[in-house]
Regions:
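Short clusters of hydrophobic/aromatic residues that line enzyme substrate/ligand-binding pockets
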Residues: 58, 64-67, 144, 154
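Hydrophobic/aromatic residues within transmembrane alpha-helices
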Residues: 14, 51, 63, 120-121
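Short, flexible helix/strand-to-coil boundary loops that buttress conserved ligand/catalytic motifs
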Residues: 25-26, 62, 71, 139, ...
Length: 164
């Protein structure tokens, strides 16, 4: 299990726990995060979720070591296990970033929140950052776009001029 859920009264804490990979996302983590946030949204006793990455990193984006194992496969996207378009629970590469929840989620960001990790932070309703925290979109250097809503969410949050 790479995701832990802790409850303290109306507060649900969702912890992404892959510190050895700087909490980089892989398909198992993505599925577990979707399940955790879907359960949080359905829980009548839960009012707010706090989301953070264990070990001093919020999320370093997609797990490139995992991605390298897909090389040479005829259908590499099939290994990512994305639900079909008619799925009642939408899931993107970063997991919950396409969910629409009825309760607020707070990102508690420490260390890097880069590429897809930045997109996860943008998905949250509020972002609280430690002094060690930073956002980045380094994947653009190699022509890899943000694919989980970041290019839409960032301008909505900070304005187009600042987002550029």
């Amino acid at each position: 299990m790479t995701v832990r859920v802790e409850k303290n009264g109306p507060v649900t804490t969702v912890i992404h726990s892959r510190p050895e990979a700087r909490n980089a996302m892989d398909p198992d983590s993505a599925e577990e995060l979707v399940a955790a946030f879907t359960a949080f949204d359905a829980d009548p006793d839960a009012s707010v979720a706090v989301f953070f990455g264990e070990g001093g990193a919020f999320c370093a984006g997609w797990d490139l070591k995992y991605a390298s194992t897909l090389e040479g496969q005829e259908e590499p996207l099939a290994a990512l296990n994305f639900p079909a378009d008619d799925s009642p629970t939408p899931r993107g590469p970063m997991g919950p970033s396409r969910l629409v929840l009825g309760k607020p989620v707070i990102a508690a960001v420490a260390g890097p929140a880069v590429a897809g990790g930045f997109e996860l932070a943008l998905w949250c309703d509020l972002r609280v950052m430690e002094q060690s925290a930073y956002f980045g979109v380094y994947c653009r250097r190699w022509g890899v776009p943000l694919i989980d809503g970041g290019t839409v969410r960032l301008p909505r949050l900070v304005g187009q001029g600042r987002a550029l």
